[in-house]
Amino acid sequence: MANLRKLGRRTDHRTAMLRNLVQSLFENGKIETTVTRAKEARREAEKMITLGKKGDLSARREALKYIYKKDVVYTLFEEIAPVYADRQGGYTRILKLGPRRGDGTEMCILELVDYTKKESSEEKETVKADK
């Protein structure tokens, strides 16, 4: 089995944290986290995008085993995966930010390459209402 970073957590806590990081990445297009967490989340995100590129029913069910929100899986298969149809891996990028102020841990931004998040009509209405 491939080496896995333990991240100072029990197995169930670690897998839940990585699932949440990947889910947030697909919802927002980018997330800010520590470098070690980003490297682990990147592994899982790349696997999920590869499943999204397959696009069949079994791939969708496999993705639902890892990502619990159906709307995030829909976004993955319908919006994110088609962007990477001609790309053979390297769907994410890690941009280092520098040390965190409290404890000096190296922080970074994990983002999807060549993907711009589409704003829904609800988000546009709230932006207009705020102005």
Curated annotation (Swiss-Prot):
InterPro entries: Ribosomal_bL17, Ribosomal_bL17_CS, Ribosomal_bL17_sf. The keyword Ribonucleoprotein applies. Disulfide bonds: none annotated. Transmembrane segments: none annotated. Coiled coil: none annotated. Pfam families: Ribosomal_L17. Keywords: Ribonucleoprotein, Ribosomal protein. One of its GO terms (molecular function) is structural constituent of ribosome. One of its GO terms (cellular component) is cytosolic large ribosomal subunit. One of its GO terms (biological process) is translation. HAMAP family: Ribosomal_bL17. NCBIfam families: L17. Part of the 50S ribosomal subunit. Contacts protein L32. Belongs to the bacterial ribosomal protein bL17 family. This is Large ribosomal subunit protein bL17. It comes from Finegoldia magna (strain ATCC 29328 / DSM 20472 / WAL 2508) (Peptostreptococcus magnus).
